[in-house]
């Protein structure tokens, strides 16, 4: 099993969801736990973001993460509507 690390930008999103949409937050946290069991099961994003993986939540939303094999850590990067994820590619590369 892998450890979980959450980027500060995603942490802000999760905090907002804890106040506005607890059902969606619960779905995200459950999916994070599933991902730590086998993170390589999930698909990579398309180029130029192919270092990142994604999983769909509630049909039109995507949770983006990357895997650090050296530290056995799954780093969760972002959660947003599917249409917006690729527009944020600069965020992922910094």
From Swiss-Prot:
InterPro entries attached to this UniProt entry: RelE/ParE_toxin, RelE/ParE_toxin_dom_sf, Toxin_YafQ-like
SUPFAM superfamilies referenced in this protein's UniProt entry, alphabetically: RelE-like
Gene, per the UniProt record: relE4
Family the entry assigns: Belongs to the RelE toxin family.
Role: Toxic component of a type II toxin-antitoxin (TA) system. Its cognate antitoxin is RelB4 (Potential).
Pfam families: ParE_toxin
Keyword field: Toxin-antitoxin system
Name of the protein this chain belongs to: Putative toxin RelE4
């Amino acid at each position: 099993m892998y450890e979980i690390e959450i980027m500060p930008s995603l942490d802000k999103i999760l905090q907002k969801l804890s106040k506005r949409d607890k059902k969606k937050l619960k779905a995200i946290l459950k999916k994070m736990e599933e991902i730590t069991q086998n993170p390589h099961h999930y698909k990579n994003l398309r180029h130029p973001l192919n270092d990142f993986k994604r999983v769909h939540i509630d049909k039109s939303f995507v949770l983006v993460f990357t895997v650090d094999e050296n530290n056995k850590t799954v780093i969760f990067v972002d959660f947003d509507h599917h249409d917006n994820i690729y527009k944020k590619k600069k965020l992922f590369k910094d």
